[in-house]
Amino acid sequence: MLGKYTAKNDKDPDGNPHGGTVVGLGINIEWQKGPLGTGMARKEPNGAFVETVIDAARQRIQFYQDSKFKCRENAIAITKLEEALMWLNKRTAGRDARGVEGTHEK
């Protein structure tokens, strides 16, 4: 069941993603504000990352899949969430290889 939620996506003065929120029944997400930086200047996260939220949903569906509610649809949903994580990790690896991970550079 898709519940109602409100989302607010914030931008910095340059138009870059800069945090935001998602709030609904049982949900209260505060997104990462700004880049983490690189090297010695790398900061601790101050908010959630999309990958973490996707993985949290994946583990919950896996919980159902490991119970009497096991079904084909759950298995497919898990696969698709794992695929989403794979693509996001591929993006991060590419950014690492280009030396721009943790920055607003492309």
Segments from the language model and where they lie:
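Long, non-catalytic architectural segments outside compact domain cores
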Residues: M1-F49, H104-K106
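Short, compact, well-ordered microdomains
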Residues: Y64-G102
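Acidic-enriched, low-complexity/disordered segments with a strong bias for Aspartate over Glutamate
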Residues: D10-D14, D55, D66, D96
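Weak global preference for isoleucine
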Residues: I27-I29, I54, I61, I76-I78
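Residues in flexible loops and secondary-structure boundaries
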Residues: G37-G39, Q62, D96
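Short acidic, glycine/tyrosine-flanked loop/strand segments centered on an H-E-D-like triad
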Residues: N46-F63
